[in-house]
């Protein structure tokens, strides 16, 4: 991929070690489908004749950094490339992990694809309000799931997204 820099974050090795130790099939699926998600972005980017600046592997999976695409329609194609992969795999495999990744990534919360799409097409103030509302609902739902004994994952994701948004303000 030419001049694309590959960055391996130490946390990527931590999550691989944890996944191997935990022997959790769902965790491996999510890691694999997250990589395929990013490959969807990469495919869309390359199809438009653009090149990523950086490919980063970290605790959160794989992330692409690229220069801003010159027009909103092509940027939309790049942003939707990842969720489209999860949607296709969800439909074809009837796999709940892909369904969850698709739905999560389409939420209008920055830095998720849905949040970036909202920022691209909606007025800034509306994007901020929409993101805050969805994040509040997601956090409340995560707290409820934890209270009912369903696990900490949703609450953890929503708190991470909340911190990401606070950092960007």
Describe the predicted segments one by one.
Residues 1-169:
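Hydrophobic transmembrane alpha-helices and their immediate loop junctions
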């Amino acid at each position: 991929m030419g001049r694309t820099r590959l960055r391996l974050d130490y946390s990527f090795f931590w999550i691989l070690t944890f996944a191997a130790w935990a022997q959790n099939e769902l965790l491996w699926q999510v890691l694999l489908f997250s990589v395929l998600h990013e490959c969807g972005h990469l495919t869309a980017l390359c199809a438009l004749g653009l090149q990523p600046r950086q490919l980063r592997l970290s605790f959160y999976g794989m992330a692409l950094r690229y220069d801003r695409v010159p027009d909103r329609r092509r940027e939309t194609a790049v942003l939707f490339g990842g969720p489209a992969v999860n949607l296709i795999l969800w439909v074809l495999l009837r796999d709940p992990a892909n369904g969850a990744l698709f739905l999560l990534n389409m939420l209008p919360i920055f830095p998720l694809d849905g949040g970036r799409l909202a920022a691209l097409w909606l007025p800034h103030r509306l994007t901020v309000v929409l993101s805050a509302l969805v994040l509040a609902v997601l956090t409340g739902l995560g707290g409820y799931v934890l209270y009912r004994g369903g696990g900490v994952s949703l609450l953890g994701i929503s708190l991470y997204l909340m911190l990401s948004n606070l950092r960007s303000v």
